[in-house]
């Protein structure tokens, strides 16, 4: 179930980076401007300011063990998906002995890895021109898992399973066909492969991009 992403007190925020300072001073006012300048998200508070209406969902909770001098130490490992249902999405991982703290760390990690997702109407079966799907076929890999996302006509829905469907929903994609190969039973690799596929939507230069550069 989607929940509101906790937002820090921006008034008390003391930026540690130049980018953070520009955001707090109001010299960067949109997330699009940040990516247009090829700047990275160096502090989670940047997302609190530029994308304040994000939602998140815990998609996996596991236990990890670490061998120490005092014996075996067990911690929670939490995986979350975060997005605004309108072209921005992220995933994050957090570990801690306390579940609540692990979730907080995962949310913070997700804020540092928000990416823009290019949407469009790339299916030859659809000519509506709306941003309901992807503009072209993309793929992503993580470990032995590979995810391929193909544009689908309007009304198809998300032909994807499990956590991948959740990721696409938070990104604001409504229609897509998905294919997967390799070891997809591991949630971490499967969701990361999907995340990298969405990241690749901005790795290709479209005719519109060429026209803008002229």
Curated annotation (Swiss-Prot):
Gene Ontology BP term (one): translation
Record-linked Gene3D superfamilies: 3.30.160.20, 3.30.230.10
InterPro entries (UniProt xref): Ribosomal_Su5_D2-typ_SF, Ribosomal_uS5, Ribosomal_uS5_arc, Ribosomal_uS5_C, Ribosomal_uS5_euk/arc, Ribosomal_uS5_N, Ribosomal_uS5_N_CS, Ribsml_uS5_D2-typ_fold_subgr
Pfam families (UniProt xref): Ribosomal_S5 (PF00333), Ribosomal_S5_C (PF03719)
Entry GO terms, CC: cytosolic small ribosomal subunit
Gene Ontology terms for molecular function: rRNA binding; structural constituent of ribosome
Domain S5 DRBM: 54-117
Keyword field: Ribonucleoprotein, Ribosomal protein, RNA-binding, rRNA-binding
Function: With S4 and S12 plays an important role in translational accuracy.
HAMAP family linked to this entry: Ribosomal_uS5_A (MF_01307_A)
Complexes and interactors: Part of the 30S ribosomal subunit. Contacts protein S4.
Free-text comment about domains: The N-terminal domain interacts with the head of the 30S subunit; the C-terminal domain interacts with the body and contacts protein S4. The interaction surface between S4 and S5 is involved in control of translational fidelity.
The family this protein is said to belong to: Belongs to the universal ribosomal protein uS5 family.
Protein known as: Small ribosomal subunit protein uS5
Gene source species: Metallosphaera sedula (strain ATCC 51363 / DSM 5348 / JCM 9185 / NBRC 15509 / TH2)
Upper taxonomic lineage: Archaea, Thermoproteota, Thermoprotei, Sulfolobales, Sulfolobaceae
